[in-house]
Amino acid sequence: MRYALERFISDIQAAIVATGKVPADLIEITTPKPNIPADRTFVTFKAAKALGVDPVRLAADLATAIVPPPDSLIGEVTATGAFLNFTLHPQRLAAAVMAEIETYGDAYGSVADGANRTVVIDYSSPNIAKRMHVGHIRSTIIGQALVHIFRALGYRVIGDNHLGDWGTQFGIILAAMQRYGRPQNEGEAAMAELEALYARYNAEMKDNPPLEDEARRWSLALEQGDPTARELWQWCVDLTMRAAQRNYDRLGVRFDYAYGESFYEAMLPGVIEEALQSGAAFRDVDGAVVAELDKLPRFIVQRSDGGTVYITRDIATIKFRLQEFNPSHIIYVVDARQELHFRQLFAIVRAMGYALDVELIHVPFGVITTPDGQPLSTKKGNMVYLESLLDDAVARARALVDAKSPTLSPEERAQIAEAVGIGAVIYNDLYQDPRRNITLDWDRMLSIEGNSAAYLQYSHARCRSILRRAAEEGMLSTEVDPGLLTHPSEQRLVRHLARLPEAVREAGARYAPFVIADWCYTTAREFGIFFEQCPVLRAETPALRAARLQLVSATANALRNGLALLGIQAPERM
């Protein structure tokens, strides 16, 4: 796909080359600052220096010499000092963008930059035998948005849910189930029972040292493949994943793989040996395998008792992914507090000779806080579990939908409430830089005004409502002239719709879904201004009405695509 703004840049380059004054290899087209009345700029300093001419004179000469062809997307060409400024031809741009959105449909905004390359995205990663809480939601939501964005960039994307299903804590869980019995419930209730068993055993263990030995024995039995230990462990894994899947289904999250840490168990001895042989790690006086790389703090790869740690399993995971998927990128969507861990992981992997030409990326994120700024924490007693959070969001959205749309059927109101409530949770996470902490502020999250998912969904539903009414009144036409869209608010909206492919590229380059969220918000805002200033169904002429209806349709389709990249539904009604 070659979009309008790409053709615009090509037109500029061709027009400059056609003057014979600057060769193609000296032309670099940039986006000017917002206060510059231009869409693209050629800054002549570098070219003028190479050609031995004055940059101001070169810009002026080019402005005089350039004559865009009749079908070019170039509008005006002006020189300001050493800056050669280009504006888009508004009518030709409108025709091009309307045609692209109609032709490409759901694929509008997608590009082929990542063709024949693979990205592995590691996200969500809940712990087995524990309920998912709001602490898991950021990785899940950000990771799923990155999956959508990189697929839109043309990559083959492998979404991997790296489950925390191994480690010393399982000795306690298995010992607790043997001591007190396994939970009899299902779903979240069973998960809550497991957590209570773990806490009960942990508390008793402090005053009863033999219980600690028992937990250690179960941990060792699990590692050695004891059938009873493995059966109990698998029961915990299956129970946890069934409960987690209900949350994933509501959030629209789909994984390609869900390999747990246990999957890499057989690789660990080989990984430790490779780390030693490559010189990436060494044995200390206590017999532990440690590494000290890139001026980072020393870290353990294998404990002195022979046990492995998180980083051991993470090294094995990278090795497997390189062999299995041959990726160009491996992206980890993990809490910012793990930043040092990933610096150490990437350093030792490269010191072992792996992933030398692969982008290893850690996408960090902040914590979720209450409206008064307090972090949500199990220890503080204010932790919110994910299922409860989603239920609460949908219940609040249902109250709003019932109040605003009482004539809709109960089934339709329930569907809209689910889309709006879940959308509010997702957008609240994605609309800003992920490094920042986010706040659970329901009033803002569910407002149909301002920067919220509900506002964006309402804008989309408003577009669809206008189009339904136009269809009912026989106003839709196949004969449309986008060149009639000359009002400034129409042209601003068209220009912004044209930016979606650029926003997708920027979001991928920065690993930042908030770029798409910002594009969606600006789309809704520009549509609101257009709708206020330009009557659609009561336009001055039928031809202008047809052009504006086409713009409404294009806005709805592009906004739906933008929301889909974030994992948010776009209801037809609200």
UniProtKB/Swiss-Prot annotation:
One of its GO terms (molecular function) is arginine-tRNA ligase activity. It is found in: Cytoplasm. Keywords: Aminoacyl-tRNA synthetase, ATP-binding, Cytoplasm, Ligase, Nucleotide-binding, Protein biosynthesis. A motif ('HIGH' region) lies at residues 126-136. One of its GO terms (biological process) is arginyl-tRNA aminoacylation. It comes from Chloroflexus aurantiacus (strain ATCC 29366 / DSM 635 / J-10-fl). Its EC number is 6.1.1.19. HAMAP family: Arg_tRNA_synth (MF_00123). Belongs to the class-I aminoacyl-tRNA synthetase family. This is Arginine--tRNA ligase. It catalyses: tRNA(Arg) + L-arginine + ATP = L-arginyl-tRNA(Arg) + AMP + diphosphate. Monomer. GO terms for cellular component: cytoplasm. InterPro entries: aa-tRNA-synth_I_CS, Arg-tRNA-ligase, Arg-tRNA-synth_N, Arg-tRNA-synth_N_sf, ArgRS_core, DALR_anticod-bd, Rossmann-like_a/b/a_fold, tRNAsynth_Ia_anticodon-bd.
